[in-house]
């Protein structure tokens, strides 16, 4: 990821519609799964600037790792302390250390290499019956300028992720798309990008928005979150998987 992107994410992450919406979707799935439990040992693998570690703490004690010292610095600015610098393909933890491993928009990164190595590492550090919650960008045809900034190596379909999870020994509990209602707008934007002039070196989709826009789009994803408690969605901008060791 371009270094400047970490600062941008840290600045907008708590209120930007995409992050706020993904937070609602994540919490809906975990609330439905754990129903009030607050004693889990949790690893956030690829913690970025740390916002997810904050909201995961309602379920237990959260440890975060990231390969980027810059990202970990932003985590410390959030007063997070259970942190380590490590790759998702070589976790510095003993086997069976965690009840839940989360990894949000990490395994798509070209620096990861073979993402299945990370899936094996996640499984190794999970306790028997422990769960993995993954979130990844969907569909290679949705690649755009944003992907160049964040160093996307690949995007996923549910079918591809299902095959990889089964291959690495997981039992799949949920596998769905998310960010479905906004899919047509995103697809139109991606198709139009080659026709539009570049506006500078920074082409990320992550940027401050008007407050009203963040509120409206967060509400849209909040509606999806309620639906996802019990039902899968057939397409979307994001792939979400909940799998068990």
PLM feature segments, named:
Residues 51, 174-214, 218, 234-238:
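Conserved catalytic loop of SAM-dependent methyltransferase domains
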Residues 132-154, 160-163:
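Short, glycine-/aromatic-enriched active-site segment of Class I SAM-dependent methyltransferases
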Residues 221-245:
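C-terminal lobe and adjacent flexible extensions of AdoMet/dcAdoMet transferase-like proteins
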Residues 1-94, 100-104, 119, 236-239:
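Conserved N-terminal segment of class I S-adenosyl-L-methionine
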Residues 162-178:
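A SAM-dependent methyltransferase catalytic signature shared across enzymes that methylate proteins
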Residues 116-131:
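A short glycine-rich, Lys/Arg-flanked "PGG" loop and its adjoining helix->strand segment in the class I
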Residues 111-115, 144:
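Short N-terminal helix/helix-N-cap motif within the alpha/beta-hydrolase-1
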Residues 105-109:
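Short catalytic micro-motifs in class I SAM-dependent methyltransferases
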